[in-house]
């Protein structure tokens, strides 16, 4: 029933080389050790009929071993991920196909020896396309010959129609009709022991033994469910629920990350600008101080030293007078001959009274004119002293 989860039940499908070939399927219960349902579809176009059968069951797909290449190659050193990069070139020495068009999967390795299976990438796309169009998601895709039970002292065999499926070892297998199989067996140096799960053929040059008889599709289904080989690796690896969820939200996460980066950059720029402004302000305050008190070169704490000067001039330090002096600093700089002698600041009235000395009245008038551009200036009576101009 669709929507239910069958933990111990699996749907095993055996595809053909082309879409017109029949598709066998079987639902097997490992817990009950029985066939729940089985059948044959007319072609791959009818795979959609198995969507309800799949339901909450894992789907395992068998593909024709005749469409794959099985080879053993030798590496210069021991197998590693770095050494695996050389496998396509080593395989290219043994086959006539373009290795760039092949999907390679490592079945096993021991020392310098590596067992591979390879299939055309185009064929992979065809098989996966059939399943996708049918709404089926397979968690494993493996060659049917590796679903045969391995034989400890030889090969295992199964006849399907006019073809023989033979498993020659843990990572090796072939598919051949009777005439080709007879030629292959005749080429063996010593007779091969073959355990057949279907009636024995009349093929000499081999030691044929009858294995336990079993329904071909059931035999393959059981073997597939116990086999680790899987063509769904690399670019064909099925997505987990987490991966699908992540792919859906990846763009959102990227945009959010970019926005956060922009925000942090702007914040950093703002803090940098504030730091630069603070540095500039401190430099300006030092300039103001040196303009008002040009004779003092050692400046450690501008605020403290300014307060000391104000005390000497008879004025209690206040923020207001510091601000006014800061704004008047450029004016003092324009009239270098004019020097403040006494300051009086009335915070309530916002009024600063200055008693200054200058070489002459021209400097005082110049100071009044410049300060008058920003402040309201009233000039009191002046007195001329000897030695002052």
UniProtKB/Swiss-Prot annotation:
Biological process per Gene Ontology, one example term: protein secretion by the type II secretion system
Subcellular location: Cell inner membrane
Periplasmic side: 266-389
Name this polypeptide is given: Type II secretion system protein L
Assembly and interaction partners: Type II secretion system is composed of four main components: the outer membrane complex, the inner membrane complex, the cytoplasmic secretion ATPase and the periplasm-spanning pseudopilus. Forms homodimers. Interacts with ExeM/GspM. Interacts with ExeE/GspE and ExeF/GspF.
Biological function: Inner membrane component of the type II secretion system required for the energy-dependent secretion of extracellular factors such as proteases and toxins from the periplasm. Plays a role in the complex assembly and recruits ExeM resulting in a stable complex in the inner membrane. Provides thus a link between the energy-providing ExeE protein in the cytoplasm and the rest of the T2SS machinery.
Gene that produces this protein: exeL
TM stretches of this protein: 249-265
Family that this chain belongs to: Belongs to the GSP L family.
GO cellular component: Gram-negative-bacterium-type cell wall; plasma membrane; type II protein secretion system complex
Gene3D superfamilies, alphabetized: 3.30.420.370, 3.30.420.380, General secretion pathway protein M, EpsM
Native species: Aeromonas hydrophila
UniProt xrefs under Pfam families: GspL_C, T2SSL
Cytoplasmic domain ranges by topology: 1-248
Record key words, sorted: Cell inner membrane, Cell membrane, Membrane, Protein transport, Transmembrane, Transmembrane helix, Transport
CDD domains attached to this UniProt entry: ASKHA_T2SSL_N
Topology versus the membrane: Single-pass membrane protein
